[in-house]
From Swiss-Prot:
PANTHER family: PTHR43509, SULFATE ADENYLYLTRANSFERASE. Pathway: Sulfur metabolism; hydrogen sulfide biosynthesis; sulfite from sulfate: step 1/3. One of its GO terms (molecular function) is sulfate adenylyltransferase (ATP) activity. Its EC number is 2.7.7.4. The gene is sat. Belongs to the sulfate adenylyltransferase family. Keywords: ATP-binding, Nucleotide-binding, Nucleotidyltransferase, Transferase. It catalyses: sulfate + ATP + H(+) = adenosine 5'-phosphosulfate + diphosphate. The keyword Nucleotidyltransferase applies. This is Sulfate adenylyltransferase. Transmembrane segments: none annotated.
């Protein structure tokens, strides 16, 4: 059976066509908050149940509970605060209990009932969510630029923000129907922000050997400089699945959600989100959602063990490498040969090779995937554009 939604019910804050027109009219008369691309994505994810059981942006009780306990105030596991930050001037005259319009690209995309307005300590947030206040950490840097106040309350979606990859996007309601239609009872979800190399493929196929289906769900949205562009990731996975997977065993769908680079906390968050899509298992790799050397390579595994009530089974798959003696991708549990035979796949080294127009060897990356990356004149996000929203 597909997994039960987190909290037991799949949230739906979308509205009927008739009500949508009424809300659109109301929005014209309401105070407006302009959203970044990341916040607009959060609105859509709340409305479509990706963030179930959340019905809106967090109130202070839940916010503090998540920061301190990694649980909502009702004790349900939740590790990343879902918050809406505003400047005092933006909500001048707005009182608790008022409705506001949430605007993206000049259009109202949702209405929100402001149930609470409260302050927050950005440094405390960084220390607890990222386990560091180092401004070199991309999540910390982004957090410190956020606004002074938080507002919490339920939202009603008027329309989804524009999605360039609409043809590749499925919402939880849709994936659940699709998984059931395929007769899948066990589904392994794979989170990624990268173009696939053979280490990823090894892990995915290992999971697929003992589940009914694989759900590949890459993040599109804000990422740090040096990460792959969204379109490169999508095209690369299309090539990999077409040439190297039984297509009836894989569902591919993009998820518009910002990377936070919060390591172990974000790994739990990624698992909860995929549980809402219907996945029963979640692949947890080496240094999941990590960046630099801020987190231990298997620190996320330890955190998962603190959440026996998560409701989705983590799959801990060790780092894969190519063994010249074995002649294939293996991991340290199944390869008896010494380090001299082992070729470890470095994401940094792969990026450098691709950036220089070199083709990585076929034991590192499939040629069809290399073709996709090299056809793009600039497959990686550059410094300034990472902060443009």
């Amino acid at each position: 059976m597909v997994s039960r939604p987190h909290g037991g019910r799949l949230v739906d804050r979308t509205v009927s066509d008739k009500r949508r027109e009424r809300l659109r009219e109301e929005a014209r008369e309401l105070p407006a908050i302009r959203l970044t691309a990341g916040l607009a994505a959060d609105v859509a994810n709340i409305a479509h149940g990706v963030y179930s059981p959340l019905e809106g942006f967090m109130l202070q009780e839940d916010y503090l509970s998540v920061l301190d306990e990694m649980r909502l105030s009702n004790d349900l596991p939740w590790t990343i605060p879902i918050i809406l930050d505003v400047d005092p001037g933006e909500i001048a005259g707005v009182r608790e209990g008022d409705d506001i319009a949430l605007v993206y690209n000049g259009k109202p995309i949702a209405l929100m009932r402001v149930e609470e307005i409260y302050g927050w300590d950005r440094k405390e947030y960084a220390a607890k969510v990222f386990k560091t206040t180092d401004p070199a950490h991309p999540g910390v840097a982004k957090t410190m630029k956020r606004k002074e106040l938080l507002i919490g309350g339920p939202i009603d979606l008027i329309e989804d923000p524009p999605e360039p990859f609409e043809r590749y996007r499925l919402w939880p309601k849709e994936t659940r129907v699709l998984f059931k239609a395929r007769g899948w009872k066990t589904i392994a979800a794979f989170q990624t922000r990268n173009v696939p190399h053979l280490g990823h493929e090894y892990v995915q196929k290992a999971a697929l050997t003992f589940t009914d289906g694989l759900f590949v769900n890459p993040l599109v949205g804000w990422k740090k400089p040096g990460d792959y562009r969204d379109e490169v990731i999508v095209e690369a996975y299309q090539a990999l699945i077409k040439h190297y997977f039984p297509v009836e065993s894989v569902v591919f769908s993009v998820l518009r959600m910002e990377m936070r680079y919060a390591g172990p906390r974000e790994a739990i968050h990624h698992a909860i989100v995929r549980k809402n899509f219907g996945a029963t298992h979640f692949i947890v790799g080496r240094d999941h959602a990590g960046v630099g050397n801020y987190y231990g390579p298997y620190e996320a595994w330890e955190l998962f063990r603190e959440f026996p009530d998560l409701g989705i089974t983590p799959l801990f798959v060790r780092e894969a490498f190519y063994c010249r003696k074995c002649g294939q991708m293996v991991n340290e549990k199944i390869c008896p040969h010494p380090e001299e035979y082992r070729v470890r796949i470095s994401g940094t080294k792969l990026r450098r090779m691709l950036l220089e127009g070199q083709r990585p060897p076929e034991y590192m990356m499939r040629p069809e995937v290399v073709d996709v990356v090299l056809k793009h004149p600039n497959p990686f996000i550059e410094g300034d554009e990472a902060f443009q929203e």
